[in-house]
């Protein structure tokens, strides 16, 4: 269809996506679920933005199906073209009809929307969420001599299969089990986190999104360039950059 006004927010069986072109304080009135005390969740990814240089559109409102993005992908034209060029060689048993879904990413609209498309293709196709986002938004691994050989091999191997989506980026994402935040290799977008004693972790571009008493703070910090922090809701664990690096580099003999 050529109807640009129609957009499927999500078909996920693990997450519910609420989005709208409304003021933040009105979202719970627009979606009455959000006013129902019986509605509970272990994680929430949110995005709030007021359009400055573009006209608001339903299909471009964030969060998208897997991520919310604060930033700009400067390499978007090349990323889109490469995604289209290699779409014929993408194969996975999890999506038998993949060849019929071209183009795999939106060739127009926002850069964030296209990035979300590619992340969704990788994850639904069977790639681990952390590996998928590291393929797309890798750290500056070439210029970090202290990286161990296994981790360097991971990035070197995967760089041959996927070009990076570069630019200022602070990204939050989820697949329903994991919730994570990752920053670009230059750290051009802020990401600060707070962990409280009641087992809440909040990650946002600034402090103060979640109300808390200072005495209840267990840990606070910020992500450096190319770093990631995540929560595993199934195992009730917080994963830091070094934890995720260890998981990725040991999955295969890169």
Model-derived features: positions:
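Conserved short alpha-helical segments that host acidic/polar catalytic motifs at enzyme active sites
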Residues: 1-254
């Amino acid at each position: 269809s050529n109807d640009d006004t129609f957009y499927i927010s999500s078909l996920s069986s693990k997450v519910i996506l609420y989005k709208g072109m409304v003021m933040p304080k009105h979202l719970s009135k627009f979606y009455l679920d959000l006013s129902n005390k019986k509605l509970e969740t272990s994680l929430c990814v949110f995005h709030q933005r007021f359009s400055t240089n573009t006209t608001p559109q339903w299909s471009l409102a964030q969060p998208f199906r897997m991520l919310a993005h604060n930033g700009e992908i400067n390499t978007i034209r090349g990323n889109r073209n490469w995604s289209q060029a290699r779409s014929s060689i993408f194969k996975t048993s999890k999506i038998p009809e993949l060849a019929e879904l071209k183009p795999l990413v939106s060739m127009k609209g926002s850069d964030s929307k296209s990035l979300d498309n590619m992340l969704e293709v990788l994850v639904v196709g069977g790639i681990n969420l952390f590996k998928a986002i590291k393929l797309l938004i890798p750290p500056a691994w070439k210029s970090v001599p202290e990286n161990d050989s296994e981790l360097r091999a991971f990035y070197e191997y995967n760089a041959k299969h996927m070009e990076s989506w570069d630019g200022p980026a602070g990204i939050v994402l989820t697949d329903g089990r994991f919730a994570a935040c990752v920053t670009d290799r230059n750290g051009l977008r802020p990401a600060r986190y707070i962990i409280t004693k009641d087992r809440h972790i909040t990650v946002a571009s600034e402090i103060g999104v979640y109300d808390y008493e200072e005495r209840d703070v267990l840990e606070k910090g910020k992500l450096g360039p190319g770093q990631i922090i995540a929560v595993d809701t199934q195992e009730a664990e917080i994963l830091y950059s070094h934890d995720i690096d260890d998981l990725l580099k040991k999955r295969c003999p890169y």
